């Protein structure tokens, strides 16, 4: 009944809204989640101490697999990270954990972001071959200034449920020739309690992140910039896994050159070279119940080049991008009874796999008229893999080649039309992706969700995606409503199937699965977003999403989000703000027992926060207090690994200074 009431409220506000004419707007097929310099959106729409994961979750295209309170795995269009491209300022970065406990999003903090650019399907193929799309995390970059300026923020706070203490700081200097951006952050959290006030063991984490960027103007139309990020996480627990993270370190560096042009077909040229290295050490020494201990260290090193040119001629614009990178991924398994000196087993779960990629893409926009726009693009990539220790692959795939080269094409096209306050869009796409390192070369990678060891297959075919999308919307000065749908038909869909040969290596495993290709799979996603200005100071927003995924036998795919909703009210008056929201999922009816899922019940969560803005001398100060899961509901979702319960009631406070 709670969920039914929420839907009635959702539609009731829409149906009673009054239309007022305002200048026309348009729907684009690209979602951009903006974080302005003052972060006004963050201060009013959600808690100020929001993480990158929590901020990404505000997009209707993003959901998460959660194995604990830290480093959630982002799912774009309900597809796992193998099918999407996640970058930082266009740079390719690959995690070093076979269990996906270090997604790219875990190597930044929210105080370093300026925006997050989310592109769906083949529109996201600029930075590499993809099926689901791309997520580009854009870091802050202060522009040059005619006058010397110093700006900064400092934010601190405390969350009571898991006793999390955090500090976030930013500082920037800008002048005519020189810009310097700096950031630092630290978070320390203990175990959290669920809705039954029971402690969830192994859910603690510690995270430190810092970064610097220096830009220098070499001429009125050109500049150079160097950037560096250092991220370290220690003592991170994962309650859904049989082991935890002892240490993770990442160093991400880049140097770039930007050239602008006056009154020319070429408007700008940007070139960047980059290098990043990640080390990730998992072990189970804090799990005394494990009969045999295991260390799982991993290393990932990537260097690459991104070069893009922007063109404009009257109503035509184009972006051409060259993308090249080289990655080496290594992961080990080391078993021992109690003493590391008495090692009983060693194996490479990633046997020194090198991936080299070179691709070029072209994305075009043509303003046909004031009411219509055509977008189209093409990409072509060359993907090369090599396994140094190919004998691990020969155990299950005798004679498999040590090297593999694949051609990865992509196409997309879309049309947008606006008339008065209405807007419409349609689009289509076609693209290939290569198997990931785990899918192609993984060796006995334990999946604690279905309790199988997974084996890669170097001879897997490319996944091939055929997609369609459409959207329709209405917007005036008082209300807005937008509906979006997309459909993916994925040929040679890669997934794990039970292998009759071989026995499990992990004593917790129930068997062995090998990655194989289904004939096809289908995915459908729908999102409905609406907003209504009840009063100048009072605004309502609502979102309704639905997805369905099936394999070639008509069976359900795993980790597909059930019908879900979010409804929120935001009140602001002078320096005072109040926000409240209810979000939840309906019962998960289309779950997949074959892939380890069980049915998760419906739930509804109520959140509430209050913030006040004031000045301390020349410092703009914001104080916020709020509560998540105010009713202390006990629940877990379809995407909680092993049905680990979510956090119960969490009271939080935050104080932010701007200067």
Where are the predicted features?
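Conserved C-terminal beta-signal and adjacent last beta-strands/turns
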Residues: 208, 215-218, 416, 422-423, ...
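Outer-membrane beta-barrel translocator/receptor signature
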Residues: 111-115, 124-196, 203-210
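Gram-negative outer-membrane beta-barrel transporters
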Residues: 367-374, 382-383, 486-490, 506-590
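Short acidic/polar hinge/loop motifs at secondary-structure boundaries
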Residues: 92-121
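Transmembrane beta-barrel wall of Gram-negative outer-membrane proteins
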Residues: 162-188, 198-234, 245-267, 309-313, ...
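Flexible loop and strand-edge segments within Gram-negative outer membrane beta-barrel domains
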Residues: 20-21, 189-190, 201-203, 207, ...
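Outer membrane beta-barrel strand-and-loop segments of large Gram-negative receptors
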Residues: 211, 296-308, 349, 353, ...
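N-terminal periplasmic accessory domains that precede
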Residues: 21, 45-56, 72-75, 87, ...
């Amino acid at each position: 009944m709670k969920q039914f009431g929420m839907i009635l409220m959702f539609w009731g506000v829409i149906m009673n809204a009054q239309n007022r004419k305002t200048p026309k707007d348009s729907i684009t097929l690209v979602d951009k989640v903006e974080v302005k310099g003052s972060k006004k959106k963050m201060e009013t729409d959600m808690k100020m101490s929001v993480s990158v994961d929590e901020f990404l979750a505000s997009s209707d295209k993003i959901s998460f697999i959660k194995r604990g309170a830290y480093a959630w795995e982002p799912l774009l269009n309900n597809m796992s990270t193998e099918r999407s491209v996640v970058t930082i300022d266009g740079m390719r970065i690959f995690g070093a954990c076979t269990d996906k406990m270090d997604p790219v999003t875990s190597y930044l903090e929210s105080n370093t972001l300026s925006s997050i650019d989310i592109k769906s399907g083949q529109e996201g193929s600029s930075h590499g071959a993809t099926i689901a799309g791309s997520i580009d995390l854009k870091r802050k970059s202060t522009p040059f200034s005619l006058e010397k300026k110093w700006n900064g923020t400092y934010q601190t706070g405390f969350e009571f449920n898991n006793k999390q203490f955090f500090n976030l700081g930013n500082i920037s200097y800008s002048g005519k020739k020189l810009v310097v951006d700096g950031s630092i952050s630290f978070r320390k959290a203990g175990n959290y309690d669920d809705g039954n006030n029971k402690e969830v063991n192994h859910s603690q984490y510690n995270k430190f992140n810092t970064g610097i960027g220096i830009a220098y103007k070499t001429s009125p139309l050109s500049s150079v910039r160097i950037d560096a990020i250092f991220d370290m996480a220690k003592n991170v627990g994962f309650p859904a896994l049989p082991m935890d993270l002892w240490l993770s370190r990442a160093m991400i560096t880049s140097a770039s050159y930007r050239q602008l042009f006056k009154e020319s077909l070429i408007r700008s040229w940007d070139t960047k070279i980059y290098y990043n290295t990640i080390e990730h050490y998992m072990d189970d020494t804090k799990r005394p119940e494990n009969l045999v201990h295991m260390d799982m260290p991993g290393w990932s090193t990537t260097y690459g080049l991104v070069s893009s040119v922007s063109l404009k001629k009257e109503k035509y614009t184009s972006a051409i991008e060259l993308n090249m990178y080289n990655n080496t991924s290594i992961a080990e398994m080391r078993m021992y009874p109690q003493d590391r000196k008495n090692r009983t087993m060693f194996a490479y779960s990633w046997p020194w796999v090198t991936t080299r990629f070179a691709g070029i893409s072209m994305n075009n926009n043509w303003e046909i008229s004031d009411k219509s726009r055509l977008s189209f693009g093409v990409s072509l990539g060359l993907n090369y893999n090599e396994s140094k220790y190919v004998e691990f692959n020969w155990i299950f795939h005798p004679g498999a080649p040590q090297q593999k080269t694949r051609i990865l094409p992509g196409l997309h096209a879309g049309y947008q039309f606006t008339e008065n306050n209405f807007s419409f869009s349609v689009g289509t796409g076609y693209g290939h992706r290569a198997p990931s390192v785990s899918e192609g070369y993984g060796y006995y990678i334990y999946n604690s969700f279905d309790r199988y060891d997974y084996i890669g297959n170097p001879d897997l075919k490319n996944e091939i995606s055929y997609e369609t999308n459409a959207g329709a919307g209405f917007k005036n000065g008082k209300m807005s409503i937008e509906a979006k749908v997309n459909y993916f038909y994925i040929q040679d869909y890669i997934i794990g199937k039970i292998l009759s040969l071989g026995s499990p290596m992990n004593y917790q495993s129930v068997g062995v699965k090998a990655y194989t290709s289904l004939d096809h799979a289908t995915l459908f996603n729908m999102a409905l977003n609406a907003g209504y200005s009840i009063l100048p100071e009072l605004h309502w927003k609502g979102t309704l999403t639905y997805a369905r995924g099936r394999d070639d036998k008509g069976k359900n795919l795993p980790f597909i989000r059930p019908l879900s909703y979010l409804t929120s009210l935001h009140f602001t008056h002078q320096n005072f703000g109040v926000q409240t929201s209810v979000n939840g999922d309906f019962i998960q009816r289309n779950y997949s027992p074959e892939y380890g899922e069980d049915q998760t019940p419906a739930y509804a969560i109520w959140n509430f926060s209050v913030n006040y803005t004031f000045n301390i001398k020349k410092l703009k100060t914001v104080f916020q207090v709020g509560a998540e899961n105010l009713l202390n509901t006990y629940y877990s979702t379809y995407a909680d690994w092993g049905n680990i319960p979510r956090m119960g009631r969490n009271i939080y406070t935050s104080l932010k200074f701007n200067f």
